[in-house]
Amino acid sequence: NLKNDLEEMSTFTLDWIMGQNPFDSSMIEGFGRNNPEYFFFNNYDYVNIPGGIVNGITSMIDDEEGIDLVMEPRSDVSDNWRWAEQWIPHVSWFMFAKCIRKE
């Protein structure tokens, strides 16, 4: 039924954010492992704060069908804001989703 399908999808989505994804990476700073670090032109001048949620896994640079998570500088990416920048709405929606779930 629809209710069960939506509950299953919400569990899958929250688990994905907390680290059950192809990169084995928690999108929540300070929770889980392999948290993405934010860098800008090979500098780590900006830091993510504990509890913040990063943008996360998106498409690949040259392939919109693929997925990617840039965790460190590489030749084709000089900054990883697209993946590792924290946004307040991510945390707000995550908290809302956790609060309305029946455990």
Regions found by a protein language model. Name each.
Residues 1-103:
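Aromatic (Trp/Tyr) and acidic
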